[in-house]
From Swiss-Prot:
EC top class named in words: transferase
Catalysed reaction equations from the record: GMP + diphosphate = guanine + 5-phospho-alpha-D-ribose 1-diphosphate; XMP + diphosphate = xanthine + 5-phospho-alpha-D-ribose 1-diphosphate; IMP + diphosphate = hypoxanthine + 5-phospho-alpha-D-ribose 1-diphosphate
GO cellular component annotations of the record: plasma membrane
Alphabetized SUPFAM superfamilies for the sequence: PRTase-like (SSF53271)
A GO MF label: guanine phosphoribosyltransferase activity
Gene: gpt
Cofactors (names): Mg(2+)
EC number assigned by the record: 2.4.2.-, 2.4.2.22
Residues where guanine binds: D102, I145
Main subcellular localisation: membrane
Name of this protein: Xanthine-guanine phosphoribosyltransferase
Organism annotation: Brucella suis (strain ATCC 23445 / NCTC 10510)
Amino acid sequence: MSLPDKAFPVSWDQFHRDARALAWRIAGLDREWRAIVAITRGGLVPAAIICRELGIRLIEIVCIASYHDYTSQGEMQVLKGIGASLLENQGEGVIVVDDLTDTGKTAAIVREMMPRAHFATVYAKPKGRPLIDTFVTEVSQDTWIYFPWDMGFTYQEPIAGGKRG
């Protein structure tokens, strides 16, 4: 499989550094946080890192699926909502975390549930950017990000093609 023209492969090390950078930015806001809501599945890894860095123990998930073929999003469906206690005060004091905002459709659904929550993503694309309060890296809309959990190691043919010298 070849990468698209605007591919952005992210290693585990790079993602960890970027998620910690996001935690630093959130810490710089100097606010009290009561919980993190991770948007599954992409928000699980950065949420774990941010929880650790900020000392937040209460973690919730919201699961929103868009049925797609990895080139276009389909209809959005909430598969698992957010617990009532975190919806109090419209999500005030809650950080909503995802790996990426692309079109902003997922963030818009969660923003309706929690309009006063703080939305944070590691990466942002221009269409989704207005819905996000804090992010680390912006990429163009036509860039495809390959996250480390989507990639695996594969055998690489030797440069010499197996010839012995």
